[in-house]
């Protein structure tokens, strides 16, 4: 049994516990978050985006009892002071958003944990993993890795198929992305000074940046410098879609692209020919769900622009990928 600790019990941390409860061989034995335990339990049980937890959670002194099993709860600001060694923690899922650098994340290792998976993009000194794209880059010697971002987990499988089958010369991606906690619910000063994220999240389409296109080079090195992109935050609480416009090294047809995507489908990369909308992907476990109905090609005098589209639940799709990465990472470390 792989013992897991979750540091940071926010959107991703809470959904990670839900997902891990469904995975044989993984057990969450501890959670660390500075928020009051009763508040955390309430937010875990009732979720406006993902629905009510299909199980039981109780709060006791220093612990949650989840489906009859005790999970220790800490409120320690310094991860180096956490009792990971005493608890025999194999992997920490680092979900606070504050410990995204290798040196900071290694505080968990100094506290006695064996490995750390960061639920956010990290520096170039760490391996960035998108499961079923480049997880085989891990050799078991790593102590800290990054699980990339939700958008990179959506983009990477689609980009990998295009690059492997047809070659990508260059491209530009746009994610039409649900709003998140780094935006304001009503107009007001933004903590990072962002004028657009200072505006009410649920009433506007809000242009934003994304590092997903450039970060793809950490997952697929052949694409370094070939992709860029941006984001448009839209008034939905979860459920997003990524559009990739690319110039390929060979001319293709819509049928050839869709066939290649269908052939590549797996637990991380789904394929659909249904005419779905964002509400239909809330709660899916695919990190990326390719939509064959939206593949388009513009051909002018033999020069092509190719548009491919993939859906994702920026919460649960990403969390599912993180848990797959964590499980794989733990196994190769032993």
From Swiss-Prot:
<dbReference type="InterPro" id="IPR006424">
    <property type="entry name" value="Glyceraldehyde-3-P_DH_1"/>
</dbReference>
<feature type="binding site">
    <location>
        <position position="314"/>
    </location>
    <ligand>
        <name>NAD(+)</name>
    </ligand>
</feature>
<feature type="active site" description="Nucleophile">
    <location>
        <position position="150"/>
    </location>
</feature>
<protein>
    <recommendedName>
        <fullName>Glyceraldehyde-3-phosphate dehydrogenase</fullName>
        <ecNumber>1.2.1.12</ecNumber>
    </recommendedName>
</protein>
<dbReference type="InterPro" id="IPR020831">
    <property type="entry name" value="GlycerAld/Erythrose_P_DH"/>
</dbReference>
<comment type="subunit">
    <text>Homotetramer.</text>
</comment>
<dbReference type="InterPro" id="IPR020830">
    <property type="entry name" value="GlycerAld_3-P_DH_AS"/>
</dbReference>
<dbReference type="InterPro" id="IPR020829">
    <property type="entry name" value="GlycerAld_3-P_DH_cat"/>
</dbReference>
<dbReference type="Pfam" id="PF00044">
    <property type="entry name" value="Gp_dh_N"/>
</dbReference>
<feature type="binding site">
    <location>
        <position position="33"/>
    </location>
    <ligand>
        <name>NAD(+)</name>
    </ligand>
</feature>
<comment type="similarity">
    <text>Belongs to the glyceraldehyde-3-phosphate dehydrogenase family.</text>
</comment>
<feature type="binding site">
    <location>
        <begin position="149"/>
        <end position="151"/>
    </location>
    <ligand>
        <name>D-glyceraldehyde 3-phosphate</name>
    </ligand>
</feature>
<comment type="function">
    <text>Catalyzes the oxidative phosphorylation of glyceraldehyde 3-phosphate (G3P) to 1,3-bisphosphoglycerate (BPG) using the cofactor NAD. The first reaction step involves the formation of a hemiacetal intermediate between G3P and a cysteine residue, and this hemiacetal intermediate is then oxidized to a thioester, with concomitant reduction of NAD to NADH. The reduced NADH is then exchanged with the second NAD, and the thioester is attacked by a nucleophilic inorganic phosphate to produce BPG.</text>
</comment>
<dbReference type="Pfam" id="PF02800">
    <property type="entry name" value="Gp_dh_C"/>
</dbReference>
<keyword id="KW-0324">Glycolysis</keyword>
<dbReference type="InterPro" id="IPR020828">
    <property type="entry name" value="GlycerAld_3-P_DH_NAD(P)-bd"/>
</dbReference>
<dbReference type="InterPro" id="IPR036291">
    <property type="entry name" value="NAD(P)-bd_dom_sf"/>
</dbReference>
<feature type="binding site">
    <location>
        <position position="180"/>
    </location>
    <ligand>
        <name>D-glyceraldehyde 3-phosphate</name>
    </ligand>
</feature>
<feature type="site" description="Activates thiol group during catalysis">
    <location>
        <position position="177"/>
    </location>
</feature>
<feature type="binding site">
    <location>
        <position position="197"/>
    </location>
    <ligand>
        <name>D-glyceraldehyde 3-phosphate</name>
    </ligand>
</feature>
<dbReference type="GO" id="GO:0051287">
    <property type="term" value="F:NAD binding"/>
</dbReference>
<keyword id="KW-0520">NAD</keyword>
<dbReference type="GO" id="GO:0006006">
    <property type="term" value="P:glucose metabolic process"/>
</dbReference>
<dbReference type="GO" id="GO:0050661">
    <property type="term" value="F:NADP binding"/>
</dbReference>
<dbReference type="GO" id="GO:0005737">
    <property type="term" value="C:cytoplasm"/>
</dbReference>
<keyword id="KW-0560">Oxidoreductase</keyword>
<dbReference type="GO" id="GO:0004365">
    <property type="term" value="F:glyceraldehyde-3-phosphate dehydrogenase (NAD+) (phosphorylating) activity"/>
</dbReference>
<comment type="pathway">
    <text>Carbohydrate degradation; glycolysis; pyruvate from D-glyceraldehyde 3-phosphate: step 1/5.</text>
</comment>
<feature type="binding site">
    <location>
        <position position="119"/>
    </location>
    <ligand>
        <name>NAD(+)</name>
    </ligand>
</feature>
<feature type="binding site">
    <location>
        <begin position="11"/>
        <end position="12"/>
    </location>
    <ligand>
        <name>NAD(+)</name>
    </ligand>
</feature>
<feature type="binding site">
    <location>
        <position position="181"/>
    </location>
    <ligand>
        <name>NAD(+)</name>
    </ligand>
</feature>
<feature type="binding site">
    <location>
        <begin position="210"/>
        <end position="211"/>
    </location>
    <ligand>
        <name>D-glyceraldehyde 3-phosphate</name>
    </ligand>
</feature>
<keyword id="KW-0547">Nucleotide-binding</keyword>
<keyword id="KW-0963">Cytoplasm</keyword>
<dbReference type="GO" id="GO:0006096">
    <property type="term" value="P:glycolytic process"/>
</dbReference>
<feature type="binding site">
    <location>
        <position position="233"/>
    </location>
    <ligand>
        <name>D-glyceraldehyde 3-phosphate</name>
    </ligand>
</feature>
